[in-house]
Regions:
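An N-terminal assembly and electron-transfer interface module characteristic of large anaerobic redox
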Residues: 1-262
Length: 262
């Protein structure tokens, strides 16, 4: 069977488009034909067995306890559950439930101020904190094969973001839970891949929306409609990138050497 035929026959799970949400009830059998409870039941069963294994049970139990503790019932609305804790509070509580004492904070150098606010909060709660920024080591981007025109600011020294170094440093301190604060897309993935300790995200980087990426979705039907634009031409993105590259190269050639005067 060809790869194309396999792709045509494969039924994809797509919970995001489900209109029934039966998984939040006992009536899972009423789900759509591509419900994971129907077409991936064996996968779910195996995952559940791993979840309740001695290796994972404590983590899963405490995570669910943490979720349950984040709601209260107000006297004037006893039938409504209301959220009661910020994410910062939840992270600290979960770490306490797990018995963690040494936490790692991996942050983007662009949010060092925010990191400087976070660390004392964690320390005041009794945690020992190791924090490391993305530019640690000042390794030049040329190490990655960057040419001058590829930099954000050609003609200037630019250190690379170094999530592998961040993870390695925190690993060397045997941190028990690592908190990520605004690492770049891609760099966050590399950090997660290389961290030996479990990780959680306090904030995801979004340069346009003040590190609140869901705002792009909330405005996707109005001011941020460009994210819905379909790429009708397969190579449209490549052409755009090629044009940007040529423009950057031209600017880099015209720019006088650093320190020179016109």
């Amino acid at each position: 069977m060809s790869r194309q035929t396999e792709q045509q026959e494969e039924v994809l799970v797509n919970c995001a488009k489900c209109t029934r949400r039966v998984c939040d009830t006992k009536e899972w059998a009423e789900g759509p034909d591509n419900c994971p409870a129907k077409i991936r039941a064996e996968v779910i069963s195996e995952a559940t067995e791993r979840c309740v294994s001695p290796e994972n049970l404590g983590f899963a139990y405490n995570a669910s306890k943490q979720e349950a503790s984040c709601y209260i019932r107000l006297p004037h609305a006893p039938n409504v559950v209301s959220p009661s804790k910020s994410r910062v509070e939840e992270i600290m509580e979960f770490a306490e439930r797990m018995g963690y004492r040494r936490l790692g904070v991996a942050f983007c150098v662009g949010v060092q101020y925010e990191a400087s606010l976070l660390v004392p909060i964690l320390e005041n709660r009794g945690f020992e904190v190791v924090s490391v920024c993305c530019k640690c080591g000042s390794v030049p981007k040329e190490k990655l094969g960057f040419e001058e025109w590829e930099k954000i600011s050609p003609g200037k020294f630019e250190p690379m973001c170094h999530p592998l170094a961040q993870a390695a440093i925190l690993n060397s301190y045997n941190t028990e839970l690592n908190i990520m604060v605004c690492l770049c897309v891609g760099h966050d993935s590399a950090f997660l891949k290389n961290s030996e300790a479990p990780c959680t995200v306090l904030a995801a980087k979004d340069r346009v929306f003040g590190h609140a990426p869901l705002l792009a979705l909330y405005q996707s039907r109005s001011y941020h409609r460009r994210v819905l634009a379909k790429h009708t031409e397969p190579d449209a993105y490549k052409e755009t990138e090629r044009a940007k590259t040529e423009s950057s190269r031209a600017k880099a050639k015209r720019r006088p050497p650093r320190g020179s005067h016109r």
